[in-house]
Each structure stands twice: as C-alpha cells, then as structure tokens.
A protein has these predicted regions:
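An edge-strand/N-cap motif at the start of beta-rich repeat modules
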Residues: 1-30, 110
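Hydrophobic beta-strand positions in blades of beta-propellers and related beta-sheet-rich domains
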Residues: 19, 59-60, 99
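Blade-level signature of beta-propeller repeat domains, shared across WD40, Kelch, NHL, RCC1
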Residues: 94-112
Length: 112
C-alpha cells in the first residue's frame, strides 16, 4: 500500500498531518495539504497526470501535486476502498467487498 509516491522531482507522502512533500529525496518534508473534507488518507497512486488517493470517504484525485483534492468516487456499493493499483489497462481497487476494476479513471467500478 503506497503511502509515498514520486511525482516528477518530488516525493509525496501521507503523514499524520495530511499530505507532505519533499524536494530533496526525503531528507526534509513540508506540509502540502491538511484539509479534512476528504477524510483520512490511506493510499496514494500516480495515475497518468493525476494523483489518486484512497481515503476514509472514497477515492479522490488531485491534478496539482496534492495541493487540492476533488471527489472521484464516494459510492458505497463497492465497500470500503483499501488500495489502488494501475494494471496498465485498468485501475484495480482492493475493497472490503473484494476486487473491483475501473476503465474510466475510477469514476465507476465493477466487481472482478
């Protein structure tokens, strides 16, 4: 479950304070996002030009390196999201109800 991803020249990670970033390979960290509207961050995935996050409220995305987040999927039919994986052709989600996949960047999910 990646809680740290490389995004261009930065490392971005989940911390107890929210989302942090480093520009010196992790020697020091600065806070980037501390909002609570997304819930608690649990997993990060770089997916194309977006940073995806599994949170306690669903799947969220950022197009600005984690400075702000928007809801991508908050439905309950899939159960609680645990982590995301890029399979190359589709997005996979391990949830409390099993394995789900998405072919539209996480906007909708089908059970595998």
């Amino acid at each position: 479950m990646p809680q740290l991803v490389r995004y261009g020249r930065e490392l971005i990670r989940i911390s107890a304070r929210g989302i942090e970033f480093s520009t010196n390979d992790g020697r020091s960290w600065l806070t980037r996002y501390t909002g609570s509207s997304c819930g608690t961050f649990m997993d990060l995935l770089l997916y194309g030009n977006e940073l995806l996050a599994v949170t306690s409220k669903g799947v969220y995305f950022s197009t600005n390196e984690g400075r702000s987040w928007l809801s991508r999927y908050t439905g309950s039919s899939c159960g609680t999201f645990l982590n995301l994986t890029d399979s190359g052709r589709e997005l996979l989600a391990n949830t409390s109800k099993g394995l789900y996949f998405s072919t539209n960047s996480g906007r909708s999910w089908l059970r595998r």
